Design a protein with these regions (language model features):
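The conserved catalytic core of RNA pseudouridine synthases
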Residues: 59, 67-68, 114-127, 161-180, ...
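Anionic-ligand-binding alpha/beta catalytic cores of soluble enzymes and soluble regulatory domains
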Residues: 126-206
Length: 279
């Protein structure tokens, strides 16, 4: 049975114009030029220090038209992205389209104008008019699936705090290109790869509890008989009594390390990622 979720946590932004591809190529971590028409990828927009001020899914319609699924929980991310657009033939427009998440059986009878396959079990449907679907899931379910897939997210609490590799973007889809040339923050991102400057990675953890910790807060790690705070929570959702977290920590953790939630002492265990963070 398919689960349909209204993804109200996103804005759909159209980027259009003869300079659209060139402009985005100089702004984003992914290789916009070599992204195939009809394809999508996670990508980041960084500040000059290489810290991410937005993280979103980019969809290429053509070299002159792109769509962005921009999370609403960031502070003016679109203003940052279009800061230099005045010097190019490119426009940004928020579209009033329906954004639907699909989990489970991908029903061929649901004909959306754009269908994005996220993985074997999930898709995003984009349509200018309401689709004939019955919503039987919620945003928490979608976030839970994102976390389980190791797909990161940013929020206002973590905006401009991390370079892309700290959230594993080097290992996800086509999120970072190390061969495309210059873009804002590129020097820091390249240094993290070629000089080993990045010492952090994002881990998925789970535990049974009714608590949902705040984004930007810490968990605790056991050191011999003591516990100390560690990491930064970047995503958190409690679904059916199980807490799922994405936490940025040192990338040299031992497999046997024990973790817990400071709020109630609940045991947290590291879950396997569907990709290698050493990519």
């Amino acid at each position: 049975m398919a689960t349909f979720i209204s993804l109200n946590q996103y804005d759909l932004v159209e980027v259009a114009g003869v300079d659209a591809e060139k402009y985005l190529q100089g702004q984003l971590t992914c290789d916009v030029v070599h992204l195939a028409a009809g394809a999508s990828t996670l990508t980041a927009h960084c500040d000059p220090k290489g810290k991410m001020n937005s993280l979103f899914r980019l969809i290429k319609i053509s070299s002159e038209q792109f769509l962005i699924l921009m999370p609403k929980n960031l502070f003016v991310p679109l203003d940052h992205l279009k800061k230099y657009a005045v010097f190019s033939k490119v426009t940004f427009q928020v579209l009033d389209w329906q954004i639907v998440g699909l989990i489970g059986e991908k029903c061929g009878r649901i004909q959306a104008q754009i269908t994005l396959d996220i993985d074997e079990n999930r898709a995003i449907l984009l349509n200018p008019t309401p689709l004939d679907v019955t919503f039987n899931g919620d945003e928490k379910q979608w976030l839970c699936a994102d976390i389980q897939a190791g797909l990161p997210s940013l929020s206002v609490e973590t905006q401009n705090e991390f370079i892309p590799q700290a959230l594993n973007l080097q290992a996800i889809e086509q999120a970072i290109s190390f061969t495309k040339g210059c873009y804002i923050g590129q020097e820091t991102v390249a240094r993290a790869k070629y000089r080993g400057a990045n010492k952090r990675a994002m881990y998925v953890l789970s535990g049974e509890t009714t608590v949902t910790p705040k984004i930007g807060s810490e968990i605790e790690m056991q050191l011999e008989k003591a516990w100390r705070k560690t990491g930064t929570i970047v995503s958190a959702v409690n679904f059916d009594g199980v807490l799922w977290l994405e936490v940025v920590m040192n990338n040299d953790l031992e497999e046997w390390t024990h973790f817990r939630l400071p709020e109630d002492g609940s045991v947290l265990k590291i879950e396997p990622l569907p990709y290698s963070i050493n990519s």
